[in-house]
From Swiss-Prot:
NCBIfam families assigned: alr
Gene: alr
Classification via SUPFAM superfamilies: Alanine racemase C-terminal domain-like (SSF50621), PLP-binding barrel (SSF51419)
Coiled-coil parts of chain: none
HAMAP family hit by this protein: Ala_racemase (MF_01201)
Stated name of the protein: Alanine racemase
InterPro entries named in the record: Ala_racemase, Ala_racemase/Decarboxylase_C, Ala_racemase_C, Ala_racemase_N, Ala_racemase_pyridoxalP-BS, PLP-binding_barrel
Organism: Streptococcus pyogenes serotype M4 (strain MGAS10750)
Annotated binding of substrate, by residue: R136, M310
Record's keyword terms, sorted: Isomerase, Pyridoxal phosphate
Family label: Belongs to the alanine racemase family.
E.C. code: 5.1.1.1
Pathway in which the depicted protein is active: Amino-acid biosynthesis; D-alanine biosynthesis; D-alanine from L-alanine: step 1/1
One MF annotation (Gene Ontology) recorded for this entry: pyridoxal phosphate binding
Length: 366
């Protein structure tokens, strides 16, 4: 979708807050540990290029989801290491080697395919993924990893790192976390040829399990000022939420008792009341199930009434406000605040998803 600069709906991204959040985590982890900024999914909706440039002096590299995200950073002039966390099939390796993008290898099947499709891996930097219990991608045994490392090196690749990902690092019950940690430690200890970089710490592990950090961390959601657990665990230090979302009233009217609002006529006024229309809808990532939630106008919580439409939503107002009056959907308005986690709790989802669903139709202002 094209970014809509000619309407009042915008996301404001505080890059200084992101820099300070990363600095706060770095103070909390052991000295000498490398920091990778996770900027996949357009930096969780904050803008991958802008965030990466802002963090350039603070981090050692970046993590993305796929090759296209890596190339976007290279084209923007980012010259530090970029690690693709997902699997890149061997038919795309030429571009990864040319643009000096580090790839994740997660199986011996990948190695066999590479031997057929791109046997010369000279110039390719690799991190090996271990499935310690997440159940998505990765190898599960010392023998497999030893064979993979030997095979990759014989084809000319540099095996720089090895890593895993925890499924429950953001939960109070650490049983599964400890099982995964012990599995990973045992596997690493059994390797004949251990890669230089070992990393297992995502945002949650970095802040709640800092004693388990190896020699690199991957900082994602905490960089953007959000609690990885939502509301389940307390943060050990304060973070600044970096993104706010705002719009304006574009239509205000009074309706009478018995009048309905929105598709399906799901809202019926019980008395005369003022209704405001705001130009944001589910095409922007403000999902239909937000009916009944509130936004902030003039420091007051105003309920979303009627179904959220593709491009608009309607709110109940305490009085008639002029067109152009500010509407806050995420962030502060006259000492009142709506957080991304508040929205996630209402939707019965996670704060990550709320941010990632904000579409590129909403301009990001820095």
């Amino acid at each position: 979708m094209i970014s809509s600069f000619h309407r009042p709906t915008v996301a404001r991204v505080n890059l200084q807050a992101i820099k300070e959040n990363v600095a706060s985590v770095q103070k909390h982890i052991p000295l000498g540990v490398k920091t990778y900024a996770v900027v996949k999914a357009d930096a969780y909706g904050h803008g991958a290029v802008q965030v990466s440039k802002a963090l350039l002096p603070q981090v050692d590299g970046y993590c993305v989801s796929n090759l296209d995200e890596a190339l976007q950073l290279r084209q923007a002039g980012i010259d530090k290491e970029i690690l693709i966390l997902g699997v890149l099939l061997p038919n795309e390796l030429k571009l990864a080697i040319t643009r000096q993008v580090t790839v994740t290898v997660a199986s011996l099947e990948w190695l066999a395919m590479a031997k057929q499709e791109w046997p010369d891996l000279k110039g390719l930097k690799v991190h090996i993924k271990i499935d310690s219990g997440m159940g998505r991608i990765g190898l599960r045994s010392v023998t497999e990893v030893d064979n993979l490392i030997a095979g990759l090196k014989s084809m000319g690749a540099e095996v720089e790192g090895i890593f895993t990902h925890f499924a429950t690092a953001d939960e109070a019950d650490d049983t599964k976390f400890n099982q995964q940690l012990q599995f990973f430690k045992k596997l690493i200890a059994g390797l004949e040829d251990k890669p230089r970089l070992v990393h297992a710490s995502n945002s949650a592990t970095s802040i709640w399990h800092s004693d388990t950090i190896f020699n690199a961390v991957r900082l994602g959601i905490v960089s953007y000022g959000l609690n990885p657990s939502g509301s389940d665990l307390s943060l050990p230090f304060p973070l600044q939420e970096a993104l706010s979302l705002e719009s304006s009233l574009v239509h205000v009217k009074m309706i009478s008792a018995g009048d309905t609002v929105g598709y399906g006529a799901t809202y019926t006024a019980k008395k005369s009341e003022y209704v405001g229309t705001v130009p944001i809808g589910y095409a922007d990532g403000w999902t239909r199930n937000m009916q009944g939630f509130s936004v902030l106008v003039d420091g007051q919580f105003c309920e979303i009434i009627g179904r959220v439409s593709m491009d608009q939503l309607t709110i109940r107002l305490p009085k008639a406000y002029p067109l152009g009056t500010k509407v806050t959907l995420i962030g502060s308005n006259q000492q009142k605040n709506i957080s991304t986690t508040d929205i996630a709790n209402y939707r019965n989802t996670i704060n990550y998803e709320v941010l990632c669903l904000l579409s590129d139709r909403i301009p990001r202002i820095y």
